[in-house]
């Protein structure tokens, strides 16, 4: 089994694992690929005549041809729910940190200390770009604290983004 795995060739469309993939047998020729490491860009399965498995590097599923792959007997695997939850929690924490910086950006040192203008969180607008697995969860969590606007390529037009950015804090 190990010998068979060592002989498998990997095709990828992501740089996520660059630096961690030394010694792995990569190919840029689809016909030679046994395994695909799939990033955020969608792929079609035409040309992958030897493919045995697709492994999604990120957490989204919208760019994976699941039904087509399974019909062809190709194994499809995604990161664990634990990994998805960790990414969500980290994204929500980063968002809270940015909100804190936005509210208290005027405060520098304590010497001389002055009482800054109080800013209400519910008056602020957060723009969440991308409402997939993580973005939708962050938007839902943050709407309890402030106004949330969302933008997603699958739901909005490109022209809407500029005005949404302008209205966001």
List the predicted regions and their residue ranges.
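N-terminal glycine-/charge-rich "phosphate-binding" loop or analogous flexible N-terminal tail
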Residues: 1-38, 138, 143-151, 156-158
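Short helix/loop segment immediately N-terminal to the Walker
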Residues: 108-118
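Rossmann-like dinucleotide/phosphate-binding beta-alpha-beta segment
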Residues: 1, 116-169
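A short, aliphatic-rich alpha-helical micro-motif
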Residues: 29-31, 48, 164-167
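Structural motif
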Residues: 34-35, 53, 125, 169
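Phosphate/diphosphate ligand-binding glycine-rich loop within oxidoreductases
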Residues: 35-107
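Phosphate-coordination loops involved in phosphoryl transfer and adenosine-cofactor binding
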Residues: 5-7, 51, 122-126
């Amino acid at each position: 089994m190990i010998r068979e795995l060592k002989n498998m060739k990997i095709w990828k469309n992501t740089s996520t694992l660059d630096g961690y993939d030394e010694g792995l047998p990569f190919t840029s020729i689809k016909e030679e690929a046994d395994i695909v490491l799939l990033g955020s860009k969608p792929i079609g399965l035409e040309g992958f005549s030897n493919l045995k498995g697709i492994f999604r590097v990120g957490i989204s599923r919208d760019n994976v041809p699941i039904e087509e792959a399974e019909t062809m007997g190709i194994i499809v695997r995604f990161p664990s729910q634990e990994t998805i939850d960790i990414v969500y929690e980290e994204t929500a924490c980063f968002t809270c940190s940015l909100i804190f910086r936005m509210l208290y950006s005027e405060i520098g040192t304590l010497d001389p200390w002055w009482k800054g203008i109080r800013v209400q969180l519910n008056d602020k607008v957060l723009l969440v770009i991308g409402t997939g697995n993580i973005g939708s969860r962050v938007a839902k969590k943050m709407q309890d604290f402030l106004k949330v606007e969302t933008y997603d390529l699958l739901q909005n037009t490109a022209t809407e983004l500029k005005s949404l950015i302008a209205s966001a804090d």
